[in-house]
Amino acid sequence: MDVSKYRKDFPILNTEDGPTYLDSACMTLRPQVVIDAINEYYTKYPACGGRSVHKLSWQVTEGFELARDSLRRLMGAESTSEIVFTKNATEGM
């Protein structure tokens, strides 16, 4: 398996002395596509999804549900109700 094609997705790993990162209990490295999505959320959709009735909230909720369905298909789940987002592994357990 050629990991170099995956490493290029993570900006920090493309520095001259790109680290070997072993502190995933503290923070998970994010690929550029995730960094871009987070930046887009904070600049265009600064709202809480699933609990407010204004347009921005609806857009956030729709984005979450699209992500949930993408994960459902990727994982082979029968229903999106099987896909649950939590803030960390401890909470998820």
Tell where the protein language model's regions lie, with residue ranges:
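Pyridoxal 5′-phosphate
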Residues: 1-93
